[in-house]
Swiss-Prot record:
The lineage of its organism: Bacteria, Pseudomonadati, Aquificota, Aquificia, Aquificales. Could be involved in insertion of integral membrane proteins into the membrane. Keywords: Cell inner membrane, Cell membrane, Membrane. It comes from Hydrogenobaculum sp. (strain Y04AAS1). One of its GO terms (cellular component) is plasma membrane. It is a peripheral membrane protein. Belongs to the UPF0161 family. It comes from the Bacteria. It is found in: Cell inner membrane. This is Putative membrane protein insertion efficiency factor. HAMAP family: UPF0161_YidD.
């Protein structure tokens, strides 16, 4: 499951993300954060951390440096 999620995020980074303007307010980007957190915490907890990060990446959040 972990590898499937990472493959999905990599697909997003390579195929879909270049079609949209860069708008992530954090470093590392949300997709890179997702890969790091899934590798570190596993599919469920890492996926939840990535989901929470995506929810926080919006115009009302300051952003900044945020590692998993």
């Amino acid at each position: 499951m972990k590898y499937l999620l990472i493959k999905f995020v990599r697909f997003w980074q390579i195929c879909i993300s270049p079609l949209y303007p860069s708008s992530c307010r954090f470093y590392p980007t949300c997709s890179h954060y997702a890969i790091l957190s899934i590798e570190k915490y596993g599919a469920f907890k890492g996926g939840m951390k990535a989901f929470w990060r995506i929810l926080r990446c919006n115009p009302w959040n300051k952003g900044g440096i945020d590692y998993p």
